[in-house]
Amino acid sequence: MTKSEQIAHLYAQNVVPTYAQSMVLVKGKGTRVWDADGRVYLDFISGIATLNTGHCHPKVVAAVRDQAATLMHVSNLFYTEIQARLAEKLAGLAGGGKCFFCNSGAEANEALIKLARLYGKDKGRFEIISMVNSFHGRTLASLAATGQTKYQAGFEPMPQGFVQAPFNDLAAVKALVTDKTAAILVEAVQGEGGIIPAETAFLRGLRALCDEKGILLLCDEVQCGLGRTGRWFGFQNAGVQPDAFSLAKALGGGLPMGAIVAAPKVADVFQPGKHASTFGGNPVAAAAALAMLNVIEDENLLARAAEAGARFKAGLETLVGKYEHVKAVRGVGLMVGLVLDQPAKALVEALRGMGLIALATAETVVRFLPPLTVKDTEIDEALEIIEDAVAEAHGVERPHDDEEG
């Protein structure tokens, strides 16, 4: 057996088979990862939008080491300075608000749902309007808010109080608002749904609708937040301010970390005992998060995400029209989807075989989520691999500069 086969065998014997793993990774640095058999890959999924500052950024690693050597965990029965500093930083980036810390995106969205219900309780408001094709997590309430029945199958009956409207359809959302509506929950970019950005007019219309009806606008920033779209938060591209929003994935710099940031009038309904997390805001995870945020600022990675995303999208767009099965490119910043007219899984597997890691989503979309630190040379290398794989799928052999003729 190879080393990879040995580890895969251990998984088969000892780990619940909820994931369809394909390779054993043992090392990461920047935009590259190494498997157990020594092969190197360009990582264009970043732990699913988690490693915005790349694998093992030295400043994040140093922050984790220093904090782990000082204080690892005390629970939220006590104050810690590192959590306070992180909350101050996030609130400042968000233009104000208060934070609640947890451990994942699903937990953060559960917190948003509980916050909205508690805020609306005195008026009998409990219902959440979310979007068709959305994804908000795998715990039962976040799953009920998710607008994709394939994830709910087998777990019925779903918790009540959730309805879905078509994404980017303001009239459809308005038609669902009742005197029981507590909040509208929306992603600025639907990631799991196929890299579909919210239209500016749609997000602004939701903000106006919520103001008119006295309900909360909640944004799920778990995948699109923290610089991935070229702004700190995806909703900022539309110039709107939600009443509360969720964060996770990239927040911990590679460690488990989730959070919500809520306007004070909303946040203050979470009084002692109303919600809690033993590990939320753990000092080591908080140190990693604060270091990650500082790296994004110090290395100007918001601008880098916008510039690198434009370069990558421009390269992908040359494939549209050139190859029959490539139909569109969409996304914002470094959250990019290559849309096919056939299942994307085969192309993703071909890319991996050529040394590039990507993801299939929404059946026909290849999803790319490279670190914000990705270099132009790495983007160009990825584009070469992608066109090689696409050409091969079309039965076309591409000439290369190093080939004769």
Segments from the language model and where they lie:
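Conserved N-terminal phosphate-binding loop of PLP-dependent enzymes in the Aspartate aminotransferase
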Residues: 1-405
